[in-house]
């Protein structure tokens, strides 16, 4: 019997990348997409990224791997550091798609998503929060997700880029 779950993933790409790098490895995004699909029945995986023109080949490969990319323009701050703050875009997309999925998986460690995660949890639409690393995961996020939080540190063997 085929599983009829229709789950969506909403991925804070910068938070995911930095979290995995802090563990000393790089994520294979193609393997991660397949993992989400096979293990958690994720039909649609939104990847929120700050748009940098020079990364066009990377964006194309992510789309080929099955991600729906949502771009945010980036600008250097006063220190010359480039950051694409995608938090509002991710929250908006979760709510736009709300009637179209059974459960949401939010991939981040960022406490700014506390209210979103609490809302999804309270309305039984949260599959879980997937955080790269327990030590860098916001206490607020842990509080709002309660028992519906998983950490990626132990997935290195399955998801590491080789």
Specify the residue positions occupied by each region the protein language model found.
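Domain-level signal for Mg2+-assisted phosphodiester chemistry and nucleotide/NA-binding surfaces
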Residues: 1-86, 119-122, 126, 132-133
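Flexible, glycine-rich phosphate/dinucleotide-binding loops
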Residues: 54, 78, 113, 136, ...
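Short, surface-exposed amphipathic charged segments that create phosphate/polyanion-binding patches used
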Residues: 62-63, 82-90, 142-144, 161-162
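A glycine-rich beta-strand to alpha-helix segment
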Residues: 91-136
């Amino acid at each position: 019997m085929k599983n009829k779950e229709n789950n969506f993933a909403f991925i804070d790409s910068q938070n995911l990348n930095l979290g995995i790098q802090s563990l000393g490895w790089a994520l294979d995004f193609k393997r991660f997409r397949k993992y989400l699909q096979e293990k958690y029945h994720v039909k649609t995986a939104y990847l929120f990224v700050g748009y940098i023109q020079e990364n066009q080949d990377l964006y194309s490969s992510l789309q080929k791997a099955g991600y729906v990319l949502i771009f945010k323009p980036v600008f250097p701050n006063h220190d010359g550091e480039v950051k694409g703050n995608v938090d509002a875009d991710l929250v908006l997309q979760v709510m736009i798609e709300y009637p179209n999925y059974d459960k949401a998986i939010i991939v981040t460690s960022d406490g700014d998503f506390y209210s979103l995660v609490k809302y999804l949890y309270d309305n039984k639409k949260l599959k879980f929060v997937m955080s790269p690393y327990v030590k860098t995961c916001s206490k607020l996020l842990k509080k709002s997700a309660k028992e519906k939080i998983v950490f990626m540190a132990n997935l290195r063997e399955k998801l590491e880029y080789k």
